UniProtKB/Swiss-Prot annotation:
Organism: Bacillus thuringiensis subsp. konkukian (strain 97-27)
Name by which UniProt lists this protein: UPF0180 protein BT9727_1277
Pfam family, one: UPF0180
Family recorded in the similarity comment: Belongs to the UPF0180 family.
Length: 82
């Protein structure tokens, strides 16, 4: 069985949060930079290119920008990076 990832998702992306939970991932809502710690990757809206400093090296994994992507496309990005 595949180990599911811990994904940080910006709080305005509720559709992405729900889709990732349905896939079995652990989803953490990103309200501050500390929320990103321990996440395998983070999904942000991209409206603020450095949302809460998460684009910095505060996480070990990828930062996925959801701007212009569908929920399915974001989920595919998560799958390919975790």
């Amino acid at each position: 069985m595949r180990i599911m990832a811990k994904i940080g998702v910006e709080n305005s992306l509720t559709d992405v949060q729900q889709a990732l939970k349905q896939q079995g991932h652990e989803v953490v809502t990103l309200n501050s930079e500390q929320d990103a710690q321990g996440c395998d990757c983070c999904v942000v809206t991209g409206q603020d290119s450095n949302m809460m400093g998460i684009a910095d090296a505060s996480i070990k994994g990828s930062v996925i920008t959801a701007h212009g992507l569908t929920t399915d496309e974001v989920c595919q990005q998560v799958e390919s990076r975790t």
